[in-house]
């Protein structure tokens, strides 16, 4: 939505949200709807410190032959071995102890929140603010997930939003399901990804000591938190077999977290409906949201990347929003940005798929 259509309702309490509400009534009437005027319209974005996650429709791929794919054989081999180990882990499920299942569930949710509430909604999009204890928790959880450090993940994700479905999009879904799911990690980046990624403003990430600390010590952190700890805890504390601890609690769990995240890039860009903006590829996909703890409302998210819920409906199939709201209730999260129902409905009427329009 253009910046001049945004309105900010400012609250002095850190436990409330900053609401992006309705555009001017004349705009709504042009779109077929009517809403009352609101008292204040801002000329700037709801997040004046952030611009580079807003879709740029003016960017077009360069004409000419596409560069030849360069395979990264190290990644191909490691991903292959990981998924073979995960498949073997499936066969061990009947022999695992109940405490191991609970441990895997705990580690899955921690890893998922490190991606969704952490690197995605906090650091990539700055949709809310977090106090130091919460940021430390999320940086640890993000390291447990092992999906690149916060700096690199955020850079790629901002490029994905700004140059979506072009060669400058790191996991461009127009290159097919496999490429957008995992293939983009198995080949060298397209030159356009490097070129346009270098133009993004990442000063907020560079200025955050915690983010740069993680980046500096990422390899030993991942070795400890993604592989050693989840293997040793069940083996040492409740006598799980080392085989089950390694292949089920570690490799299978890690592979499932990876694929749940990847489905947001692949399935949620191809399968589902587009109630908010039919001109973009991202879709609403409930199944993806189940696995990715709330990240499947993707048409909404690409339309309103500044909404901390990444969804119109807050807690509906969205554990991440529930978690952030709990953190706000105890004072660890604040300044949550939320698009109002009026603004979402206005956008739906203007650009949504006809079958999704209502009211």
Curated annotation (Swiss-Prot):
InterPro entries recorded: Acyl-CoA_DS, FADS-1_CS
Sequence intervals crossing the membrane: 73-93, 98-118, 218-237, 242-263
Compartments in which it is found: Endoplasmic reticulum membrane
Residues the record lists as Phosphoserine modifications: 203
Annotated catalysed reactions: octadecanoyl-CoA + 2 Fe(II)-[cytochrome b5] + O2 + 2 H(+) = (9Z)-octadecenoyl-CoA + 2 Fe(III)-[cytochrome b5] + 2 H2O; hexadecanoyl-CoA + 2 Fe(II)-[cytochrome b5] + O2 + 2 H(+) = (9Z)-hexadecenoyl-CoA + 2 Fe(III)-[cytochrome b5] + 2 H2O
EC number: 1.14.19.1
UniProt binding sites for Fe cation 2: 160, 269, 298, 302
Residue numbers covered by motif Histidine box-2: 157-161
Motif placement: Histidine box-3: 298-302
CDD domains documented for this protein: Delta9-FADS-like (cd03505)
GO cellular component, one term: membrane
Keywords: Endoplasmic reticulum, Fatty acid biosynthesis, Fatty acid metabolism, Iron, Lipid biosynthesis, Lipid metabolism, Membrane, Metal-binding, Oxidoreductase, Phosphoprotein, Transmembrane, Transmembrane helix
GO biological process, one term: unsaturated fatty acid biosynthetic process
PROSITE patterns given in the database record: FATTY_ACID_DESATUR_1
Ranges in the topological domain labelled Lumenal: 94-97, 238-241
Binding site for substrate: 75, 148, 155-156, 188-189, 262
Bilayer topology: Multi-pass membrane protein
Cofactor(s) the protein requires to work: Fe(2+)
Molecular function GO terms recorded: iron ion binding; oxidoreductase activity; palmitoyl-CoA 9-desaturase activity; stearoyl-CoA 9-desaturase activity
Binding-site residues for Fe cation 1, renumbered to this chain: 120, 125, 157, 161, 301
Note on cofactor: Expected to bind 2 Fe(2+) ions per subunit.
Enzyme superclass (EC): oxidoreductase
Domain topic, free-text comment: The histidine box domains are involved in binding the catalytic metal ions.
Similarity comment text for this entry: Belongs to the fatty acid desaturase type 1 family.
Biological role: Stearoyl-CoA desaturase that utilizes O(2) and electrons from reduced cytochrome b5 to introduce the first double bond into saturated fatty acyl-CoA substrates. Catalyzes the insertion of a cis double bond at the delta-9 position into fatty acyl-CoA substrates including palmitoyl-CoA and stearoyl-CoA. Gives rise to a mixture of 16:1 and 18:1 unsaturated fatty acids. Plays an important role in lipid biosynthesis. Plays an important role in regulating the expression of genes that are involved in lipogenesis and in regulating mitochondrial fatty acid oxidation.
The protein's name: Stearoyl-CoA desaturase
């Amino acid at each position: 939505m253009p910046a001049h259509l945004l309105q900010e309702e400012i609250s002095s309490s850190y436990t409330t949200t900053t609401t992006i509400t309705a555009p001017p009534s004349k705009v709504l009437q042009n779109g077929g709807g009517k809403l009352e005027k609101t008292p204040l319209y801002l000329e700037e974005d709801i997040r004046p410190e952030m611009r580079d996650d807003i879709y740029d429709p003016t960017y077009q791929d360069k004409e000419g032959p596409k560069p030849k794919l360069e395979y990264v054989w190290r990644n191909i081999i490691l991903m292959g071995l990981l998924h073979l180990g995960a498949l073997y882990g499936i066969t061990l499920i009947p022999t695992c102890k109940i405490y191991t299942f609970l441990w895997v569930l705990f580690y899955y949710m921690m890893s998922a929140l490190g991606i969704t509430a952490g690197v995605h909604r906090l650091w990539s999009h700055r949709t809310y603010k977090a106090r130091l204890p919460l940021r430390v928790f999320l940086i640890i959880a993000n390291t447990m997930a092992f999906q690149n450090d916060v700096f690199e993940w955020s850079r790629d994700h901002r490029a994905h939003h700004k140059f979506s479905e072009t060669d400058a999009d790191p996991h461009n879904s127009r290159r097919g399901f496999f490429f957008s799911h995992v293939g983009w990690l198995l080949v060298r980046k397209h030159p356009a990804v490097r070129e346009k990624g270098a133009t993004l403003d990442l000063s907020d990430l560079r200025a955050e000591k915690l983010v740069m600390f993680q980046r500096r010590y990422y390899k030993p952190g991942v070795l400890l938190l993604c592989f050693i700890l989840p293997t040793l805890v069940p083996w040492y504390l409740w006598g799980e077999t080392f085989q089950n601890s390694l292949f089920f609690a570690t490799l299978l769990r890690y592979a499932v977290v990876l694929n749940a995240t990847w489905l947001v890039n692949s399935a949620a860009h191809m399968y589902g409906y587009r109630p908010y903006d039919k001109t973009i590829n991202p879709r609403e996909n409930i199944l993806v949201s189940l696995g990715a703890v709330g990240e499947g409302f993707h048409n909404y998210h690409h339309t309103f990347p500044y909404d901390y819920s990444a969804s119109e409906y807050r807690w509906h199939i969205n554990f991440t929003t529930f978690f952030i709201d709990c953190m706000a209730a105890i004072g660890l999260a604040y300044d949550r940005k939320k698009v109002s129902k009026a603004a979402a409905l206005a956008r739906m009427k203007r650009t949504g798929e006809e079958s999704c329009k209502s009211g």
